[in-house]
């Protein structure tokens, strides 16, 4: 990864801190993974703070596959089965069946409806019957241990929410270029500057968590 493109956003520690501050304020952040992995950048929001306007931006500017990152505990609480029994995807992305709020939505496609579905899924005391399946929101199961276990956007999302002191659930979607191709780091930086959002890479988060663990130990 050409780290020089990230230099305007600070050093790795500063990039993580800026992302945490943005999430606490209800704003979005951009997370890029390793070049030898997906080599993509995701727009990420806190599930509890995301607004319909932000959802509309995500639908408009990104791939349209809006994913809700959930912990294994929440997946069990909602009794969400995995999308397939045997996952053969290259990066072992943990898709469950898709969901829709059982109440308070129309077709489930609009930005407001997707926010309603997300709020329903992360509500305290939520149960399986609060959701219909299938739907227009794609839950993702994060691996326990976060990015120190799997260096994926799903785990990065959960780790960021925990570090920010928020509910450990987030919403992500892959950023695309205007021509429909996937945005790489230069395009992610351009998007960040356009929308005044911080950028960090998963490597930054791994270093931050590792350093914190050393300090705590």
Curated annotation (Swiss-Prot):
The protein's annotated pathway: Cofactor biosynthesis; riboflavin biosynthesis; 2-hydroxy-3-oxobutyl phosphate from D-ribulose 5-phosphate: step 1/1
Reactions mediated catalytically: D-ribulose 5-phosphate = (2S)-2-hydroxy-3-oxobutyl phosphate + formate + H(+)
Keyword Lyase: yes
GO MF terms, alphabetically ordered: 3,4-dihydroxy-2-butanone-4-phosphate synthase activity; magnesium ion binding; manganese ion binding
Biological processes per GO annotation: riboflavin biosynthetic process
Function recorded in the entry: Catalyzes the conversion of D-ribulose 5-phosphate to formate and 3,4-dihydroxy-2-butanone 4-phosphate.
Protein name per Swiss-Prot or TrEMBL: 3,4-dihydroxy-2-butanone 4-phosphate synthase
Originating species: Tolumonas auensis (strain DSM 9187 / NBRC 110442 / TA 4)
